[in-house]
């Protein structure tokens, strides 16, 4: 039995920084074209922009939480869906290094989710997201017989409400507490 099983998103994150990423604040014009905050992160269109060394990490609600729990000494598993690709392999390798059991589901239909985080010098960020396999976790794929834990932690991203509800109902029927992070 695990202390905690995390269920939800797993992504390959790429952090990019550059002094050439500029923040533009122009309420008069930006709100008119759909920028609700009246702010935009900008760089020259068509340019070649120098960046600092890219940082590649594992991200996503389920994997980030699993690493946190494992580092605190909890026996942890992560139920995630990834693609059969290098990014998925990298995520699995990191979870092994962090002593996390993976209840992984792999698919050829979608690649592993990716996020590219553009960090401006001021610390503000813009995130480009490909949700990939993470949002495609289906109810019929969940190995309910393996959800043996003292706690479940659910960070679903865009996993369907029906799937999340069934997992919560399953946990409630077995008196397993659930922590829910709607992402």
Language-model-detected regions and their locations in the chain:
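Glycine-rich phosphate/adenosyl-contacting loop at the front of the ribokinase-like
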Residues: 1-77
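Cofactor-binding loop segments of dinucleotide-utilizing enzymes, especially the Rossmann-like FAD-
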Residues: 7-9, 81-84, 107, 119-121, ...
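Anion (oxyanion) recognition and catalysis
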Residues: 70, 96, 172-173
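A glycine-rich helix N-cap at a beta->alpha junction
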Residues: 94-111
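Conserved phosphate-binding/catalytic loop of the ribokinase/pfkB sugar-kinase fold
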Residues: 103-107, 117-161
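Conserved beta-alpha-beta core of the PfkB/ribokinase-like small-molecule kinase fold
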Residues: 151-183
């Amino acid at each position: 039995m695990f202390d905690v099983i995390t269920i939800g998103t797993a992504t390959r994150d790429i952090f990019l920084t550059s002094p050439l990423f500029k923040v533009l604040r122009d309420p008069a014009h930006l709100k008119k074209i759909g920028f609700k905050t009246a702010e935009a992160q900008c760089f020259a269109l068509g340019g070649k922009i120098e960046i600092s060394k890219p940082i590649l990490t594992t991200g996503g609600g389920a994997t980030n939480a699993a690493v946190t729990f494992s580092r605190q000494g909890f026996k942890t598993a992560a139920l995630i869906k990834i693609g059969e690709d290098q990014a998925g392999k990298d995520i699995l390798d990191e979870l092994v290094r962090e002593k996390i059991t993976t209840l992984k589901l792999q698919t050829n239909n979608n690649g592993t989710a990716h996020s590219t985080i553009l960090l401006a010098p001021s610390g503000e960020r813009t995130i480009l997201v490909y949700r990939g396999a993470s949002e495609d976790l289906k109810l019929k794929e969940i190995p309910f017989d393996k959800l043996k834990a003292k706690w479940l932690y659910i960070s679903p991203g865009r996993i369907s409400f029906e799937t999340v509800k069934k997992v919560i109902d399953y946990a409630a029927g077995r008196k397993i507490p659930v922590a829910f992070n709607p992402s």
